[in-house]
């Protein structure tokens, strides 16, 4: 899981990175973007390079709602970019799936059904509605509301330490995709491998802390309420791994 703060496609030489990954990674490639830079030319370049999944965050049905959530964003343009992508995938008969996602929040909660209906009918393979999270506690207003709602709820382990690692453009490996300010970074990728980092004492200690509900050594996790929005396989509602295993099952067996 490679990420940057902002749109992934804005990374310099992004096309070259994707082409290299397609040739050498021997795994499935998922590109997450807001659709702003997703021209037909770029879409075809990525599809030809072997991108398997596009996960596009749009967050609104109405243009005026989008402008409130994504200031200076142009939903009309970005929506058309996604519709063009659907057309390119179909006409080129590419083996690629499209996920359109939506973070439900006060500005858009009255148009969730419209959003789901539109994109299901438009040809998206999955339409995902996510809960608004606190960016691992960084968004204090969201964090405070979540903590109030969770005050009588028994805490469960967060799924993320068992689900993924994140790799930043700066070469840091972290354990939390919700954390945007770097507190989950624990090692430089140049000093390890994904396998070694995943099986490291640090990650095993982190998992044990979540299982024991004892965060003495992991204050970043202790203060974060976003565990409540992660879904384990036996819970109601699909999690990210469930969706990806359906989209690209051969990669997860």
Q: What are the functions of these language-model segments?
A:
Residues 167-170:
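Short, acidic, Ser/Thr-enriched surface-loop or helix-capping motifs
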Residues 159-161:
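Short, small/polar residue-rich loop motifs at catalytic or cofactor-binding pockets
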Residues 87-97, 121-156, 172-232:
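C-terminal accessory region of radical SAM enzymes
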Residues 1-4, 204-213, 248-253:
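Short Fe-S-cluster ligation motifs
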Residues 1-3, 7-120, 125-130:
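Radical SAM/AdoMet-radical enzyme domain recognition
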Residues 9-11, 39, 62-65, 107-112, ...:
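Short catalytic/ligand-binding loop motif for oxyanion handling, primarily in non-cytosolic enzymes
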Residues 236-248:
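Short cysteine/histidine-rich metal-coordination sites, predominantly Zn2+-binding motifs
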């Amino acid at each position: 899981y490679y990420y940057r703060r902002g749109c992934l496609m804005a990374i310099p030489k992004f096309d070259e990175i994707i082409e290299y990954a397609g040739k050498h990674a021997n795994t499935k490639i998922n590109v997450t973007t807001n659709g702003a830079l997703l021209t037909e030319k770029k879409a075809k370049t990525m599809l030809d390079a072997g991108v398997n999944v596009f996960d596009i965050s749009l967050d609104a049905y109405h243009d005026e709602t989008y402008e409130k959530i994504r200031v200076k964003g142009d939903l009309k343009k970005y929506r058309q970019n996604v519709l063009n992508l659907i057309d390119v995938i179909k006409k080129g008969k590419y083996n690629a799936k499209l996920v359109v996602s939506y973070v439900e929040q006060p500005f858009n909660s009255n148009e969730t059904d419209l959003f789901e209906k539109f994109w299901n009918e438009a040809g998206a393979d999955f339409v995902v509605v996510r809960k608004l999270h606190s960016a691992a506690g960084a968004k204090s207003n969201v964090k405070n509301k979540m903590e109030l709602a969770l005050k009588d709820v028994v805490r469960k382990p967060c799924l993320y330490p068992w689900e993924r690692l994140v790799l930043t453009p700066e070469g840091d490996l972290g354990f939390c995709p919700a954390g945007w300010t770097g507190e989950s970074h624990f090692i430089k990728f140049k000093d390890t491998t994904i396998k070694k980092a995943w099986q490291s004492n640090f990650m095993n200690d982190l998992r044990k802390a979540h299982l024991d509900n004892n965060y003495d050594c992991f204050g970043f996790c202790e203060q974060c309420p976003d565990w409540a929005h992660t879904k384990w396989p036996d819970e109601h509602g699909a999690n990210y791994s469930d969706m990806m295993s359906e989209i690209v099952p051969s990669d997860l067996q």
